Amino acid sequence: EKPIDPYSYDKGKFVDIRSAKQLRGWKVVDDWTPTVKGNTRKGFVHVPMLVTETAGSSLSFDFEGRAVGIFCAAGPQACILEYSVDGAPFKKLDTYTDWSRKLYIPWVYLFETELVPGHHNLRLRVAKGDKTGCQIRNFVVNE
């Protein structure tokens, strides 16, 4: 049975952070805890996280699907991410939320949601600015 909306998230899934390639300024921390003070949520502390605290940090992520994003802990240093799918011009997304000042809040950010089904490449980098932190728990993909 076909969904009413062809871009619904009925085939959404989490993808392991270790699927990222060409890590520049990013690293996987197997037992992550915040370096900047802030409250946390269960499932987003003492778990593996793909982290950076540096402007210009970049990575590449190959995936199969129609949508791509990240599930992150958007805390006090939550950055502006620049992203490109399949070599398109980079777009910006501010990951800082209304609650980020005191809390590493679990948040899903979708970068692209209506891609042609198939193989794609995400390029992600941290913009220059006052806030340069990013903690990714999972990539999210909708097949």
Residue ranges and their predicted role:
Residues E1-E143:
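Conserved catalytic region of serine esterases and O-acyltransferases that act on ester linkages
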